Curated annotation (Swiss-Prot):
InterPro entries: Carbonic_anhydrase, Carbonic_anhydrase_sf. Keywords: Hydrolase, Metal-binding, Zinc. PANTHER family: CARBON DISULFIDE HYDROLASE, CARBONIC ANHYDRASE. It comes from Thiobacillus thioparus. Its EC number is 3.13.1.7. This is Carbonyl sulfide hydrolase. Its cofactor is Zn(2+). It is an enzyme of class 3 (hydrolase).
């Protein structure tokens, strides 16, 4: 069986975690618009994730879609549909990570803090270790912050079984959304494949998340 591009990138990650990064920085010259590996990656915006480095991707090989948490929301789906149908990607890689900031709050808590609730401001400040400055007013946008479901924990708390399962549950939730979207085919000649991972920020290693399994939601 021919190795998938995702499997090849996992081998790059093994080398990266061992101190042998395969990403080559620098402008490579003219490139085609379609990603040469036919891969799209959805990942968290966390500064500790250098997606190109940890997957050994070169310029022009993949689409990189990033947001807070690496969550599969409407905009991520919009990007994936365009990536697949117009730019010929067929493998989707979803990357969450340990010590994620999306574990440190709930949607209701952050919204209350932004609107000026003193108790919420204090709790967020305790979680983040910095003074939280409220906007002091309400806003309908964004409609949700999409924090991972569960009790808030201190920002950048050490990895635990509970936090790992919360992250894995959101990976599975994202996989389910992608696999069940009517415009992202999983069968036939134009089928996509989707796999989800947790990146350990302490070791540099990607760990695959089993699917199906327990799924999370937004806090």
């Amino acid at each position: 069986m021919e190795k998938s591009n995702t499997d090849a990138l996992l081998e790059n990650n093994r080398l990266y975690a061992g101190g042998q990064a395969t990403h080559r920085p620098g402008h490579p010259g003219m490139q085609p618009i379609q990603p040469s590996r036919r891969v799209a990656v959805v990942a968290c915006m966390d500064a500790r994730l250098d997606v190109e480095d940890l997957l050994g991707l070169q310029t022009g090989e993949a689409h990189i879609i990033r947001n807070a948490g690496g969550v599969i929301n409407e905009d991520a789906i919009r990007c994936l549909i365009i990536s697949h149908h117009l730019l010929n990607t067929h493998e989707i890689i979803l990357v969450h990570h340990t010590r994620c900031g999306m574990l440190a709050f709930t949607d209701d808590l952050l919204r209350a803090g932004l609107e000026g609730d003193a108790a919420a401001e204090k709790l967020i400040g305790q979680a983040t270790g910095r003074a939280f400055v409220s906007a002091g007013k309400a806003s309908a946008s964004p409609a949700a912050f999409q924090a991972f479901r569960g009790p808030p924990e201190p920002l950048d708390a050490p990895r635990s079984d509970a936090s790992t399962e919360r992250i894995a549950a959101d990976v599975r939730r994202g996989l389910s959304i992608i696999l069940n979207h009517p415009w992202l085919p999983t069968a036939g000649p134009d089928a996509i494949t989707v796999r989800g991972f947790i990146y350990d920020v302490d070791t540099g290693r990607l760990e695959e998340v089993s699917y199906p399994g327990p799924m999370g939601g937004f806090g």
